[in-house]
Amino acid sequence: MALRFPRFSQGLAQDPTTRRIWFGIATAHDFESHDDITEERLYQNIFASHFGQLAIIFLWTSGNLFHVAWQGNFESWVQDPLHVRPIAHAIWDPHFGQPAVEAFTRGGALGPVNIAYSGVYQWWYTIGLRTNEDLYTGALFLLFLSAISLIAGWLHLQPKWKPSVSWFKNAESRLNHHLSGLFGVSSLAWTGHLVHVAIPASRGEYVRWNNFLDVLPHPQGLGPLFTGQWNLYAQNPDSSSHLFGTAQGAGTAILTLLGGFHPQTQSLWLTDIAHHHLAIAFIFLVAGHMYRTNFGIGHSMKDLLDAHIPPGGRLGRGHKGLYDTINNSLHFQLGLALASLGVITSLVAQHMYSLPAYAFIAQDFTTQAALYTHHQYIAGFIMTGAFAHGAIFFIRDYNPEQNEDNVLARMLEHKEAIISHLSWASLFLGFHTLGLYVHNDVMLAFGTPEKQILIEPIFAQWIQSAHGKTSYGFDVLLSSTSGPAFNAGRSIWLPGWLNAVNENSNSLFLTIGPGDFLVHHAIALGLHTTTLILVKGALDARGSKLMPDKKDFGYSFPCDGPGRGGTCDISAWDAFYLAVFWMLNTIGWVTFYWHWKHITLWQGNVSQFNESSTYLMGWLRDYLWLNSSQLINGYNPFGMNSLSVWAWMFLFGHLVWATGFMFLISWRGYWQELIETLAWAHERTPLANLIRWRDKPVALSIVQARLVGLAHFSVGYIFTYAAFLIASTSGKFG
């Protein structure tokens, strides 16, 4: 018999039903479960696939550069970043005739184009790119890296070049190389690029390979470095009247500590950014020399972890046994990596708008909104993934003997306390927050808005004040605002920081009030509930009081028959599945809050947010309905405009989202009956019955149908909000 898909599982390949195809796709990347897999092949396959991943990333970023160079308007955008709309790429075939062609021909283009809301124009401009030729060069370089990555991936699958398992498990060498090489050297290289290329470009100096060695980034060259007069590099920074990209008002400093924003670009000072990367490089280069490898000096990870035993003996054996547990479990390592990356991605969302690093991006409101929302959603998916792999670790890799009485074992032993406390926190937050919103809603509905319960977030305002924000008047607590102590306290802050934090036109430390207090607690409810579901899923993955032998059923079992009082919906996979809905829900609240607060800030009517955000009808009417007006006006006498495509996507997103429920709220019997009826009709229809198939059609399993439903729900939800966000923001601000 010819080899059938999937080749990695002979059992599945012989399945006579369509289950073969779906289960084959579902387990294609679960290398551990494949036939003939060994630990060595598992590590080697994953290692090689990383190079493939890198190749795809380099190809994709190369495509961004290439399409902007070919079809974009980068050179004209550089001349006037605030008024020219950046073009992402052309639209080959604008449907719906001449009106569509006219609607989508903008940004100075000759034909229909898409506008870029990704911030790449601002990024490339900030790092010193100025011409289409620069973009093409970058695209070619990334293509070259992509090819190198593919070759490396192929090479490391050849017998001679396959690394051994011991190489993969050499934690100290990997730490040293990743800390020094990945973070240290790359940060140092980036500092070099900023100092040698980007900062000169911001001062009107065009540095490329042909004059790279002739143009000194600083008038005194390396002199101050070798004579120890490093402060000279910070003297004479760009003035507040500096015009970015020109020599007008430019200084000579390359490494500064100014704080705050460049007045014209509203972004962080490039010289501050270079200084930051140099400091990061120094720290990581040192950190990458701390672990013991061939030279017998430095820390051993195993010794470090084994030494971490809490004194007094009341907290067990601390980190004993963790080294082997983590080093031998890919799921544990992936869980840690995803948890870290998820947090960092959310921090990127937060910092990209509050402390913008790229020139003029703060004035491109649609891009700001798109980037914030994008990074928060990505963070949500990555963080839920961390718990999924944590649960798989407990099922497949956790060894109770090896971890006796250490922190891992103790987490499992007192899991009831953890889960019940999280549950209590979620219930408290949910009922109190909803209670306040509903009370305020009713007061508005009955025409007595003065009876709302409005709570000032005094602790958050105090924290903002402690960081130099003066508008709340917390200095009323001081005996004197002109004393030496007060003045000395002001000098702690960088001068630019105090200006920025008290300037109401940026997004740094936004002024907050009762509406913020409420939505903050709604978001806290979402975060705690999502965490509750995820933590419970991982801690109960091995077993619970109801089902002590759960680990024997694997990660994603649907049910264990009719016994035990019902065991459906309690696999670790089910917890992940439920948590994703809560995650999406939470990020919905986060992005609604961010977007509405910023729309009112940018339009100069912050009182709309402040007054309407304290009750539910305000959110529904003054945020969602008011801002979706351009998307739901259907056919009108004015025909097509450039928002029409978003209106269509808004509708389509709702359709995809609603389709999710078809899979989520119906069970296998319905689908099996439907499929058999369709197959019966097919076999009796002339012409159609010439097409035959070998696999007997069967319905998706319960778990698969849930996955399909979840995928439609998630994709539809995000599509819908993306269309709403981009259309409502670009409709107002361009």
From Swiss-Prot:
Highest taxon, organism lineage: Eukaryota
Protein residues bound to chlorophyll a B3: M662, Y670
Quaternary structure and partners: The PsaA/B heterodimer binds the P700 chlorophyll special pair and subsequent electron acceptors. PSI consists of a core antenna complex that captures photons, and an electron transfer chain that converts photonic excitation into a charge separation. The eukaryotic PSI reaction center is composed of at least 11 subunits.
One Pfam match: PsaA_PsaB
Protein name, UniProt field: Photosystem I P700 chlorophyll a apoprotein A2
Naturally occurring in which organism (per UniProt): Nicotiana tabacum
Binding site residues for chlorophyll a B1: H654
HAMAP family tied to this protein: PSI_PsaB (MF_00482)
UniProt keyword list: 4Fe-4S, Chlorophyll, Chloroplast, Chromophore, Electron transport, Iron, Iron-sulfur, Magnesium, Membrane, Metal-binding, Oxidoreductase, Photosynthesis, Photosystem I, Plastid, Thylakoid, Transmembrane, Transmembrane helix, Transport
Entries under NCBIfam families matching the protein: psaB
Reaction(s) catalysed (UniProt annotation): reduced [plastocyanin] + hnu + oxidized [2Fe-2S]-[ferredoxin] = oxidized [plastocyanin] + reduced [2Fe-2S]-[ferredoxin]
Localization per Swiss-Prot or TrEMBL: Plastid, Chloroplast thylakoid membrane
Listed GO biological process terms: photosynthesis
Function, as annotated: PsaA and PsaB bind P700, the primary electron donor of photosystem I (PSI), as well as the electron acceptors A0, A1 and FX. PSI is a plastocyanin-ferredoxin oxidoreductase, converting photonic excitation into a charge separation, which transfers an electron from the donor P700 chlorophyll pair to the spectroscopically characterized acceptors A0, A1, FX, FA and FB in turn. Oxidized P700 is reduced on the lumenal side of the thylakoid membrane by plastocyanin.
One GO term describing the cellular component: photosystem I
